[in-house]
Amino acid sequence: MSIFDSIILGIVEGITEFLPISSTAHMIIVSTLLGLKQSVQNVAFEVIIQLGATLAIVLIYLEKINFKEINLWKKVLIAFMPLAVIGFLLRHQIKALFTIQTVAWMFIIGGIVFFIVEKIYSEEKVKIRDVEKVSLREALIIGFFQVFALIPGTSRSGATIVGGMLSGLSRKTAADFSFLLAIPTMFAASGYELLKNIDSFTNQNMTVLAVGFVVSFIASYIAVKLFLKYVQKYTLNAFGVYRIIFGIILLYLINQGIITS
């Protein structure tokens, strides 16, 4: 992998990891276009750029990371538990689910879900506009919605934001809680992959890793900041359209043999 490859993949990871469009398919397509094959070394690289993207979330919400916000973090950890438990118990079955076809169809289904949720969502019925006022019940509901993200192509942020909106949170508040929930979720996932692939780091080009990490951090920071402004004014329908179109294109590429599992 070259430095150019690491820059491109860092940008793609940083932009797509926390937007409700799922980073999985984007990384697959871009890696294919760059001529990169799946390898232990490339998996290690993906872990590093995920950590870079997650660190951007930490910086954005740094003011929330203190003992004064202990009640908020209790709710975040409660929301994290369903994914942690179910993900661990069903880890082998989840791995078997991963096919490019599954990713493509989940893109389309996720896009349709966005339209349905926006159809029934009403700003007048919003009960919570401050992330600190999210209750334990609502946190747990969002946590169970996050479990859907175990299905490849679903989008963790998309699932949790939808769960928050259906629980009475404003779009912005749902996004805030989703990103706070990403901190333990992503660190746990990245930490697990890091330990599993620790031997692969010995043969890595540290410059490539460092560049990917920094680029992913910057891209993620900008993407999340812009998204938080976006959801205060607009619906998720644009992301729904994008997901459906992207899913159809992905199915076409699979059918043509351009992308394979």
UniProtKB/Swiss-Prot annotation:
Any one GO cellular component localisation term in the record: plasma membrane
Stored InterPro entries: UppP
EC number, as in UniProt: 3.6.1.27
GO MF entries: undecaprenyl-diphosphatase activity
The UniProt record lists the keyword Cell wall biogenesis/degradation: yes
Subcellular location: Cell inner membrane
Topology within the bilayer: Multi-pass membrane protein
Biological process (GO), any one: cell wall organization
Ranges annotated as spanning the membrane: 1-21, 43-63, 70-90, 97-117, 134-154, 175-195, 208-228, 239-259
Misc: Bacitracin is thought to be involved in the inhibition of peptidoglycan synthesis by sequestering undecaprenyl diphosphate, thereby reducing the pool of lipid carrier available.
HAMAP family (alphabetical): Undec_diphosphatase
Name of the protein this chain belongs to: Undecaprenyl-diphosphatase
Species per Swiss-Prot/TrEMBL record: Nautilia profundicola (strain ATCC BAA-1463 / DSM 18972 / AmH)
